[in-house]
């Protein structure tokens, strides 16, 4: 079970998430209350263990800007959370071996997500970042060929049920482990990760289990 803590805005929360067992941390570069500057993210990512996957979240950004910001920030993976086309997504994937394409649960393109040329699919609520749940059975519409990351309204209390019902490859949380704006709650982070992994059939095994070439240029 791959667990990503998203919406990281400071070094303390990044280190906390790693210490609690997170496999990845996400930084939002799209306009948002959780938006962070590339230089600040770089200062954080260089303090993290190399096995931790650092993910930059973008929305409707031109591919050249995504690539530029990602390199400045020192992140290893890209998450596209907007209306990016298959061609745009593939262009970005030409520079980053691990690109996650996010889809809202009501997106009519979900059954054809494999056209975007990524290995990873993140399934979110219709209003990303709202903290609201959606009908998990919709996950059945996602292509079987893709690794599914479930997001949207997950909390320490419901993530176990979500993992048992959907059997995703991974889970993603932001507001569900929030203490206050811009800060994570240590106990919520700990319980979320523990509950997600406790209900998983398979445990995530680090970079041996992800399609990422760390020397890829």
Question: Which residues are covered by each model-predicted region?
Answer:
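Conserved N-terminal beta1-alpha1 strand-loop-helix module at the mouth
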Residues: 1-217
